[in-house]
Amino acid sequence: MEQTNKIDELLEKTCYVIGVFPEQVKPDAGGQYFDIEYYLLNSEKHFSLKDRFVNVILKLMCYHHVSIQWKGWIDRPSPQTVEKAISKIMGNHSGWLNILLPEEDTLVVFEWDCLNLSVYNPSENVQSIMQKIAVSEGLFWRKSEVNET
């Protein structure tokens, strides 16, 4: 219950994202965002996307203590558990994975229908490493336009 309360608290904090786009696509952009999003999430391309997000989380686990919310809380999950959870979520087209960095008071959220990972309340230390990890996976790190505090 304590970790659930912590998640609720962190979801109200400043949010950053690691994603495939360098900035939020505006509703009036005139492009084909929804077609592209659907394609990336529902074609064979979703395997590449899954691999990138798994790699981000695994790399993060090298630098920080991590607990995940997957069928209960798992402290210091194995790399296989992380990959299995994300694969199952993407395969089912349903669900999310909460990744808590308890010593940093930071929350990373993976949702099956998003082209990004949301990172709530990252310290400067977490921001620095996440930006480098994002670049290493061909992704972008930016402050979210949502949840600004």
Residue locations for each model-derived region?
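Structured alpha/beta or helical-core interaction and ligand-binding surfaces enriched in interleaved
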Residues: 1-116, 121-149
